[in-house]
């Protein structure tokens, strides 16, 4: 596959699922882009906000360990329903409305990814690895838009919830895609609140130490740096500005490029 046609994987944060207009703008931008370009696209998504809502309605208290949701196996049907069901189909609905040939998938479909339990203390939380790219490559070749939830199935036949960032990295490795993290920020800001065009580990560590990068942005940056270690580089941009997304897809500099 040539560089011009290298797939782009868009990882969507769960917060965008609560913003109907942002979703419509996003998929409209993708539709505009694909009218003139043939670059294969994929989406991997989380859905923590919807999981929280479902568990709350079930009167289930949710706990986290080092930022990862503890998911007892008796809770995984609700979590899988929220992620592979509600979250995935909300995105599918917007994609289809925009005229995109979207296909809703999980990490398990077509044996795309293998998963093992991450930590017994976390319960039904898995870590995935690339396995078989045939299904995704076929869909991409035929012009479909895979929309992939972070639910996987282990060799033990049990359902697992995988961190969506890690799932996105794994799918990128599987199909040779570039990775774009879309969140609610334009990129990483410097001390003057200007977007940093390119960020490496050394600069990120300094800005975190100086508390220029902190709280939620620090979490995003650390995830991006981890992804860059495996993929070479990733992009951070905002779903709030769909016009910038079209520019980014066209190869223009938008947001922050995170490198090793």
Curated annotation (Swiss-Prot):
The record marks 11, 220 as: Transition state stabilizer. InterPro entries: AceGlu_kinase-like_sf (IPR036393), AcgluKinase_fam (IPR004662), ArgB (IPR037528), Asp/Glu/Uridylate_kinase (IPR001048). GO terms for molecular function: acetylglutamate kinase activity; ATP binding. Coiled coil: none annotated. Its EC number is 2.7.2.8. Pathway: Amino-acid biosynthesis; L-arginine biosynthesis; N(2)-acetyl-L-ornithine from L-glutamate: step 2/4. One of its GO terms (cellular component) is cytoplasm. Its main location: cytoplasm. It catalyses: N-acetyl-L-glutamate + ATP = N-acetyl-L-glutamyl 5-phosphate + ADP. Substrate binds at residues 47-48, 69, 161. The keyword Plastid does not apply. GO terms for biological process: arginine biosynthetic process via ornithine; L-arginine biosynthetic process. It comes from the Bacteria. Keywords: Amino-acid biosynthesis, Arginine biosynthesis, ATP-binding, Cytoplasm, Kinase, Nucleotide-binding, Transferase. Catalyzes the ATP-dependent phosphorylation of N-acetyl-L-glutamate. Belongs to the acetylglutamate kinase family. ArgB subfamily. This is Acetylglutamate kinase. It comes from Psychromonas ingrahamii (strain DSM 17664 / CCUG 51855 / 37).
């Amino acid at each position: 596959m040539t560089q011009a046609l290298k797939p782009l994987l868009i990882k969507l944060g769960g917060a965008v699922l609560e913003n109907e207009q942002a979703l419509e703008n996003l998929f409209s931008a993708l539709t505009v882009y694909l009218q003139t370009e043939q670059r294969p696209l994929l989406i991997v998504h989380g859905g923590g906000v919807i999981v929280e809502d479902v568990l709350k309605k079930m009167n289930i208290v949710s706990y986290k360990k080092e930022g990862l949701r503890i998911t007892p196996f008796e809770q995984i049907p609700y979590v899988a329903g929220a992620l592979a069901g509600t979250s995935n189909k909300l995105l599918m609905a917007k994609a289809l409305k925009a005229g995109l040939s979207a296909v809703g998938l999980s990490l398990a479909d077509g044996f795309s990814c293998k998963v093992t339990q991450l930590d017994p203390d976390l319960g039904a939380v898995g870590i995935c690895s690339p396995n078989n790219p045939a299904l995704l490559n076929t869909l991409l070749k035929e012009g479909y838009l895979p929309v992939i939830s972070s639910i996987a199935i282990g060799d033990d036949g049990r359902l697992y919830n995988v961190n969506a960032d890690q799932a996105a990295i794994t799918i990128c490795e599987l199909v040779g895609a570039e990775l774009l993290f879309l969140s609610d920020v334009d990129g990483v800001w410097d001390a003057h609140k200007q977007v940093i065009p390119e960020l490496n580990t050394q600069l990120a560590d300094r800005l975190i130490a100086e508390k220029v990068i902190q709280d939620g942005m620090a979490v995003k940056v650390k995830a991006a740096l981890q992804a860059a270690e495996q993929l070479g580089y990733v992009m951070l941009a905002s779903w709030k500005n769909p016009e910038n997304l079209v520019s980014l897809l066209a190869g223009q500099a938008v947001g922050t490029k995170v490198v090793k």
